[in-house]
Amino acid sequence: MSKYKIIMTGGGSAGHVTPNLALVPKLKELGYEIQYIGTENGIERKIIESENIKYHIISSGKLRRYFDIKNFSDPFKVLKGVFEAKKIIKREKPNIVFSKGGFVSVPVVIGARLNRIPVISHESDMTPGLANKLAAPFCNKVCVTFPETLKYIKDNKGVLTGTPIREELFKGSKIKGYEICKFKDTTKPVLMIIGGSLGSKVINKSVRDALSNLIKKYNIIHICGKGNLDESLQNVEGYVQFDYVKDELPHLMATADLFISRAGANVIFELLALKKPNLLVPLSAKASRGDQILNAKSFEKSGYSMVIEEESLNSEVITNKIDELFKEKQKYIKNMNSSSANNCVDKIISLIEKYKK
């Protein structure tokens, strides 16, 4: 029988889920039973259930900063989710709740507070997301990745921890990566494209438009997002595409020499930890609250990343930038090697241990 019980939450994108998984091995080692609360159709369900973690479903509406007709109905879904989460938490009696943000987390955090269960949350980006802003008053502590984020967290609740990184990412095998990709010319450097868990149409198009030039110099691993595979490119030598990867990811990342990526905090800190030179294409301000732009600028200023605005992206620019990145890769690796950032799993675990009921 487990000594303690923790309920985790977070969803909407993989970035609100995978940091939770980074904590799981250590929590199990300490004797915690782990359960998860998420939505029925969210990406979190697929990820969590594949880890054999007990999964509870609640209702939740999306939290938006812009006008949408659903803004009139979604608050009622959130309210329903609060009562559902409250009931689950009352029944399961966890010692603590850990939230990684995303719209599903708000009713869970409120449900925990209504049951007088302590809550630790984590904010990866430089400026807190709407869900974490709404949840913060109900949390005991809010872990943050960037020092600049602390000024947004009231009541002295902010704790600088960094972002948790899954241990398995450090155990990838380059040999297994090549076996998965079946590249014939192993002398070429490998370029890997990550457009986020949902994919990026603008990155996908720019890469595919530049493909005839890129594959002359690079083998290419393209994670393009669910529903974004291009069947016409399935047999192109030196180019392999996936809609989504899980167990293969550490091996693919070990194989890659260069990356093109969105600038979500989780993925950029993974690239930093693995010392992988990268070209970041943050989500535009029109399509987001601008958090990825701030993340990217911070990494560019530190010399960890090359950055290009989404609006400037095209096949010619992407080819030139990747060639430039490859020529200067040692400079970026040197800068990343001098970084003081490290895996923060132990820091977050110590807070969980301190505040558990």
Curated annotation (Swiss-Prot):
The lineage of its organism: Bacteria, Bacillati, Bacillota, Clostridia, Eubacteriales. CDD domains: GT28_MurG (cd03785). GO terms for biological process: carbohydrate metabolic process; cell division; cell wall organization; lipid glycosylation; peptidoglycan biosynthetic process; regulation of cell shape. Gene3D superfamilies: Glycogen Phosphorylase B. Belongs to the glycosyltransferase 28 family. MurG subfamily. This is UDP-N-acetylglucosamine--N-acetylmuramyl-(pentapeptide) pyrophosphoryl-undecaprenol N-acetylglucosamine transferase. UDP-N-acetyl-alpha-D-glucosamine binds at residues 13-15, 166, 197, 292. It is an enzyme of class 2 (transferase). GO terms for molecular function: UDP-N-acetyl-D-glucosamine:N-acetylmuramoyl-L-alanyl-D-glutamyl-meso-2,6-diaminopimelyl-D-alanyl-D-alanine-diphosphoundecaprenol 4-beta-N-acetylglucosaminlytransferase activity; undecaprenyldiphospho-muramoylpentapeptide beta-N-acetylglucosaminyltransferase activity. InterPro entries: GlcNAc_MurG, Glyco_trans_28_C, GlycoTrans_28_N. It catalyses: di-trans,octa-cis-undecaprenyl diphospho-N-acetyl-alpha-D-muramoyl-L-alanyl-D-glutamyl-meso-2,6-diaminopimeloyl-D-alanyl-D-alanine + UDP-N-acetyl-alpha-D-glucosamine = di-trans,octa-cis-undecaprenyl diphospho-[N-acetyl-alpha-D-glucosaminyl-(1->4)]-N-acetyl-alpha-D-muramoyl-L-alanyl-D-glutamyl-meso-2,6-diaminopimeloyl-D-alanyl-D-alanine + UDP + H(+). It holds the Pfam family Glyco_tran_28_C. One of its GO terms (cellular component) is plasma membrane. It comes from the Bacteria. Keywords: Cell cycle, Cell division, Cell membrane, Cell shape, Cell wall biogenesis/degradation, Glycosyltransferase, Membrane, Peptidoglycan synthesis, Transferase. Cell wall formation. Catalyzes the transfer of a GlcNAc subunit on undecaprenyl-pyrophosphoryl-MurNAc-pentapeptide (lipid intermediate I) to form undecaprenyl-pyrophosphoryl-MurNAc-(pentapeptide)GlcNAc (lipid intermediate II). It is a peripheral membrane protein. It comes from Clostridium novyi (strain NT). It is found in: Cell membrane. The gene is murG. Its EC number is 2.4.1.227. Pathway: Cell wall biogenesis; peptidoglycan biosynthesis.
